[in-house]
């Protein structure tokens, strides 16, 4: 199931850098993280769903690239985002 419009707007409101911000790295990573967590739960129940697993791997790679970009450009924003999302335990 895809992310609902309400849930996506809630995530955007929480991580937006300014009003109307939907494309900043923080927002993109937060939305991807929600989708990755949701797909992880699906994969745990449906172990043979290889198409979804491939989509999950693509999303993880996209998030990894965005986080690498953010770390290169602004380390403080990167650390705050990692902390708030609970990544890199």
From Swiss-Prot:
Top-rank taxon, per record: Bacteria
Presence of the UniProt keyword Coiled coil in the record: no
Signal peptide: none
NCBIfam families referenced in this protein's UniProt entry, alphabetically: S15_bact
Organism listed in the record: Streptococcus agalactiae serotype V (strain ATCC BAA-611 / 2603 V/R)
Function according to Swiss-Prot or TrEMBL: One of the primary rRNA binding proteins, it binds directly to 16S rRNA where it helps nucleate assembly of the platform of the 30S subunit by binding and bridging several RNA helices of the 16S rRNA. Forms an intersubunit bridge (bridge B4) with the 23S rRNA of the 50S subunit in the ribosome.
PROSITE patterns, per database record: RIBOSOMAL_S15
Keyword rRNA-binding among UniProt keywords: yes
Cited SUPFAM superfamilies: S15/NS1 RNA-binding domain
HAMAP family: Ribosomal_uS15_B
GO molecular function, one term: rRNA binding
GO biological process, one term: translation
Gene that this sequence comes from: rpsO
Protein name, UniProt field: Small ribosomal subunit protein uS15
